[in-house]
Amino acid sequence: NQNSSEAAVRGLYQLQSFDLNVMMGRYRGISRVGFSGQTLVANAYKIYIEIGTQEEHSIYNGSKKSYPVQSLLGVGYEGSQDFTLRFEYFENGQGLNSEEFAQMMRMRTMFPSRFGGATSLSTPFVRQKFLIASLSLPEVQKKYNITASGIGSLEDDSALGIFRFEYLVGDRFIVGLSQTQILGQDGSQYQYRSFDSQTMADLRFSF
């Protein structure tokens, strides 16, 4: 859109052991604002929070605006050079609440051709409340990176697990292998998933 303008401003502030960050701006015609803060406890435990919102227009009334809030609260253990462990609670204000989700499922049942086999995995956050856990093992024996992550919905019986293995061939060359596992019963956000399990391999070379 040639008539849209884009601008952003960011502020950083340190209050004793707290790091605070505020950002606001307009990107692709959408106003956005966000806040984040973090602190380190006992030189090992990182506690952090992120809150953000952006302008949205109703799909039923283009002139009606809303500002759904997304928030994340997390705690991570970073007291070891061998691994990091994180647990997070994510509330997705842009996701579907129970009534909206039920309406979407009815629409899929009544008009399956409209969805054309599309999968809910365009985003793992279709609903609103999630728990996230991740474990990272960097440079195991100076040759491997290993990461395991899990996302679980608190509103239906669905979960997503991701395991990634990287082999450090050299300073600029990495061979990666990723495995994604999906769990979702009928009526969950992953009911219309396109796969239950997926394996992907990739090569990365930096110049």
Named regions from a protein language model:
Residues K143-L168, I174:
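C-terminal/domain-terminus segments
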Residues L131-L135, Y167, F173, Q181, ...:
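Outer-membrane beta-barrel "beta-signal"
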Residues N3-A7, Q14-Q16, G29-V33, K65-S71, ...:
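Residues that define the transmembrane beta-barrel architecture of outer-membrane proteins
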Residues N1, L15-S17, M24-R28, T53-H57, ...:
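Transmembrane beta-strands of outer-membrane beta-barrel pores
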Residues L12-K46:
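Loop-centered beta-sheet repeat module
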Residues G34-S36, K46-P138, S149-G150, Y190-Y192:
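Extracellular/periplasmic loop regions
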Residues L12-Q16, Q38-V41, G76-S80, S136-V140, ...:
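Structural signature of outer-membrane beta-barrel channels/translocons
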Residues L15-V22, A44-Y48, D82-L85, Q141-I146, ...:
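Repeated loop/turn-to-beta-strand initiation elements of outer-membrane beta-barrel proteins
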